[in-house]
A protein has these predicted regions:
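Mature extracellular/passenger domains of Gram-negative fimbrial/pilin and adhesin proteins
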Residues: 2-5, 21-192
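Bacterial N-terminal signal peptides
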Residues: 10-21
């Protein structure tokens, strides 16, 4: 009988320990939740400008009113919206024919019939873009100095004020001639 008792204990003890171990692991089970996110470098913005800007609402401008100090101009906004992305430096290029015959680079389309006159395009800049007294010089609106590698593109949404001024540059061109003056411009947004 002693032998049977020992066998019974040897069966019960491992069974109880096994059951206790299973119960213990069920009680000790936990869960962990992880949210994975990433900031992807790249992106872009939409850029819009008025389809046309008429200085003095298209009224005639007497040539004698156009001097080195005159301000015959119209303002308009370049709008940046829908910006998405992260970590790159924005820039805006300005495409358009320009001429320096007046002593200063001015925008003027080849179809213009006036001579020695052009459009002096300038900007006061914005919180994100630097000012420029003459965009025909380097044909770009440059970004302010910031930590762009740590900046979300959504901060670029907004307006950049521009000013189009009828100009004769230094007004020293030998053959200043009145006529129709046009300047066709294209603004391109880059996020590099």
């Amino acid at each position: 009988m002693t032998l049977t008792k020992t066998s019974l204990y040897s069966l019960i003890i491992p069974t109880v320990l096994y059951a206790a171990g299973m119960g213990q692991s069920a009680i000790a089970a936990t869960t962990a939740t992880t949210k994975i996110s990433a900031a992807i470098v790249g992106g872009g913005c939409q850029i819009t400008a008025p389809s046309s800007v008429s200085i003095r609402n298209g009224e005639l401008i007497p040539a004698e009113e156009i001097t080195t100090t005159s301000d015959i101009s119209e303002t308009f906004d370049l709008t940046i919206l829908g910006c998405k992305g992260y970590g790159l430096t924005p820039s805006i290029t300005v495409e358009g024919d320009s001429d320096g015959a007046s002593g200063e680079n001015l925008f003027v389309s080849t179809g213009s019939t006036s001579t020695g006159y052009g459009i002096l395009l300038s900007t006061d800049g914005s919180s994100n873009f630097s000012p420029s007294d003459n965009l025909a010089t380097d044909k770009k609106i440059t970004a302010q100095t910031k930590e762009w590698d740590k900046t979300y593109a959504a901060t670029l949404n907004g307006k950049i004020p521009l000013k189009a001024t009828v100009s004769c540059g230094t007004c020293t061109a030998n053959d200043l001639q009145g006529g129709e003056l046009t300047a066709s411009l294209t603004f391109n947004f880059f996020y590099n």
